[in-house]
């Protein structure tokens, strides 16, 4: 795993811990996916599912209801420093969820 992908994954793990503490949300399936696929592939799989089905992930919905979209995986994908890890379609999908025009 390259340095940027590792940085992305570690950021997701930090957000996961904050979500558990601040929103009482334990993203068990997301944690399992991180362990199995790594951060970038997990994000790509969840984004692909969202694009295909038109439905957001359970984690996104839970954090939205908690008022903490800053803790979502989609928020991380939108960060300029991680743009090289994702396609323009994946970034556009996440920007739309974040309300970025």
Task: Provide a role label for each language-model segment.
Residues 64-101:
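Amphipathic alpha-helical binding modules
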Residues 3, 21-24, 30, 73, ...:
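Short, well-ordered helical secondary-structure segments
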Residues 9, 15, 31, 42-43, ...:
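Functionally constrained cores in energy, signaling, and assembly domains
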Residues 1-22:
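Charged, compositionally biased N-terminal leader segments and the immediate start
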Residues 16-68:
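Amphipathic alpha-helical packing elements
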Residues 10-13, 37, 55-56, 88-101:
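Compositionally biased terminal segments of proteins
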């Amino acid at each position: 795993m390259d340095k940027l992908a590792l940085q992305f994954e570690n950021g997701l793990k930090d957000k996961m811990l904050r979500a558990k503490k601040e929103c009482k949300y334990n993203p068990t399936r997301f944690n399992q996916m991180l362990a199995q696929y790594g951060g970038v592939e997990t994000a790509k799989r969840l984004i692909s599912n969202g694009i295909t089905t038109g439905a957001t992930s359970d984690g996104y919905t839970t954090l939205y209801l908690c008022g903490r979209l800053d803790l979502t995986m989609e928020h991380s994908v939108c960060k300029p420093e991680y743009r090289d890890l994702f396609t323009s379609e994946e970034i556009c999908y996440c920007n739309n969820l974040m309300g970025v025009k």
